[in-house]
Amino acid sequence: MEHFVTLFDSTFLPNGLALHKSLMRTTADFHLWVICMDETTERALTELKLVNLTPIPLATVETPELRSVKGSRSIAEYCWTLTPFSVEFVFERDPNVERVTYVDSDVWFTKSPELILAEMGSAGSLITPHAYSPEHADNIKFGIYCVQFMPFTREGSTQIRRDWQSKCLDWCYAIDEPKRFGDQ
């Protein structure tokens, strides 16, 4: 079974529902974990009782370290800050999960993500650089890596997850600075 985790608030609820639908259409055996960034999202997902989906209330995953930076970040920045922790939340909740893929809530799968995951082989994580077309090359200022689809294994990615978490706790803003932006 493939495990995916995402996070969104009620503004992105339609996107998250579309993500779930695309997984239902393309992936035989999966589970989608959703960190609910507001009570409206938590309530809606709980009431919908979608198969293969577990809503996770934000309050249950916020650590003291995360709460300490929450007030200094916009909602988007706080979501970015949570991203590297989201995989950890799934590993903590289910000790049988061997791999979790973080996926942005606005992703729509047209084919099975297992095709991409097979490329990973025995690697502990799969991190891909943005592939901006020449006419959009200036977007590199918004980050080097494509965060929208990032698989991590439980055992083989501990160090990279910890490093990313630490860096996002330290700095995760929508400010164009040399060599960093948001959760990059």
Task: Tell what function each PLM region has.
Residues M1-Q184:
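Glycosyltransferase catalytic domains, chiefly GT-A lineage
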